[in-house]
Amino acid sequence: MVRDRVIELFRKALAQGADDGRWPAADAGFSVEAPRDPKHGDFAVNAAMVLAKQAGKPPRELAQAIVEAVRAADTAGDLAGLEIAGPGFINVRLSPDLWLRTLARAVAEGPAYGRTAVGQGKKVIVEYVSANPTGPMHVGHGRNAVVGDGVQGLLRWAGFDVSREYYVNDYGAQVQTLARSVHLRYQELHGRAVTMPPKSYPGEYVKDIAAGLKAEYGARFLDAPEAEWLTLFRDHAVQHVLGMIREDLAAVNISFDRWSSEKALYESGTVDRFLRFLEEKDLVYVGKLPPPKSKKGQPPPQAQPDEEGVTAAEDLTLFRSSAYGDEVDRPVKKADGTPTYFCADIAYHWDKRQRADALVDVLGADHGGYVPRLEAAMEALGASRKDLHVVLIQMVSLMRGGESVKMSKRAGTLVSLREVVDEVGRDATRFIFLTRRSDAPLDFDVELAKKQTLDNPVFYVQYGHARLAAIFQKAREAGHAVPEFDLDAARTLGSPEEQDLIRRIAAFPDLLAAAALAYEPHRVAFYLQETIAAFHSWYTQGKKSGEKVIGPDPVKTAARLFLCRALKQVLANGLAVLGVSAPDRMESPETRDIADDV
């Protein structure tokens, strides 16, 4: 990375200055960032401002001394200019040759170009999807799955040791409701008239589960008391639905390293051990929740059960989460002694933290209020809040013909992820889910996703990769060998458009590292769209101006082909990060072979 070269030179200069007694520290944790205005240079370094107090000198005076030391350290001539700006920033301009050499690096590293070691092998567990095993995955789950997979992929490229994890909520009331729904369909299959309650699960898959149980057990549980069949029906239904979920995930090329069961946390004694741990650390006590707040001028409302089924009137075992920044203390054990869902959830995070250095949770935006209590739990358990990062996923609206498709979970009219993938394809599904920030609502236009036009964002990027492949096909037909890097030839890449593409290629590793540390895979999708737009513009302009990639000047042709070679590699790598294919052949928007368009 060109940024790495700047850091290397400044560290070398600072170390030499420290040895000479010109300032007190060799590495003061300075930053190297691209300035907002490119006119100010390629990078801005704040080393003088960071060191000024320790050195006992004004920042601008110290900056001048650092500039002299950096110039002395730059024996290879990689820096074209160093200027002092503002309160003491050092603006850095890189030599044109240093930029050009990044093309050689991109080609030499090939499929590994963009990988960095910023993660230093740190163990991270990324938990995503974790949809309740009560039905097939809908499009909202799909966005969570793709964003989560993008996050874990970025972390791998940045040098983290990543484990992908799915938390299966197979213990609570919802899976019992599923079991009862299956039993009603089981009765129906035996000829009985049944009425499905409002909160039951209405999908056809429930009938399939019931049919499997009927085939295996006949009428054995038709009139049996619930205690005899509830656990069996629950476990059978959960396994059936998990099979559906695995198939849905496979359709978008997503798999997990570990499936963690909530039920297993109880059966293994993990939840009980965790409760004892809380008691030993004096992190819990018996008390009541605060009463519900009344609106101004109105009587206090009646205490209603919360999402855990507990009320302010009961004696509960409360976790001291308010001491760690939460609004109130949270119940971990109900009045009847049974653990709450929150208890099992923080026990799960306690277990995960023992297996990793850091945790990433990818949750629906409706869980935003849940985050402070998780952060409080992490801190109370001796970890840092920074050891947990939560990525929130906003809603998805499915669009068809310019209108929103109405979906209702209760009415059973949710559009499944599988339906969308079957209609628009894996690549379009994955890429479009990443065309907006995860914390912003997304309109998924099904008709647009199917179009083979440049209005379709995934087609636009893949078309660019295929056009680059077609350029090399044409070059071979014209007798041009696949070029190797030649610095003298590369110096002919002087147009503003070519310089822009070179800088975009050079920025790719930094882009991936920054996106990984921010847990934002959409940055890669944005980069690919912007970079391919720059390529299409350069390519089209070259055809109009007579400066084609494959032209009469063999030196310029070799240089432009090498630029295309590096760019093609970056596009392929960027698409790979997002789990999207990079085809070499496609139909052009006008339905002719793309090779005819180069």
From Swiss-Prot:
A motif ('HIGH' region) lies at residues 131-141. Pfam families: Arg_tRNA_synt_N, DALR_1, tRNA-synt_1d. Gene3D superfamilies: Arginyl tRNA synthetase N-terminal domain (3.30.1360.70), HUPs (3.40.50.620), Isoleucyl-tRNA Synthetase, Domain 1 (1.10.730.10). Signal peptide: none annotated. InterPro entries: aa-tRNA-synth_I_CS, Arg-tRNA-ligase, Arg-tRNA-synth_N, Arg-tRNA-synth_N_sf, ArgRS_core, DALR_anticod-bd, Rossmann-like_a/b/a_fold, tRNAsynth_Ia_anticodon-bd. It catalyses: tRNA(Arg) + L-arginine + ATP = L-arginyl-tRNA(Arg) + AMP + diphosphate. It is found in: Cytoplasm. One of its GO terms (biological process) is arginyl-tRNA aminoacylation. GO terms for molecular function: arginine-tRNA ligase activity; ATP binding. GO terms for cellular component: cytoplasm. Keywords: Aminoacyl-tRNA synthetase, ATP-binding, Cytoplasm, Ligase, Nucleotide-binding, Protein biosynthesis. Residues 288-309 are annotated as: Disordered. Its EC number is 6.1.1.19. Monomer. Belongs to the class-I aminoacyl-tRNA synthetase family. This is Arginine--tRNA ligase. It comes from Anaeromyxobacter dehalogenans (strain 2CP-C).
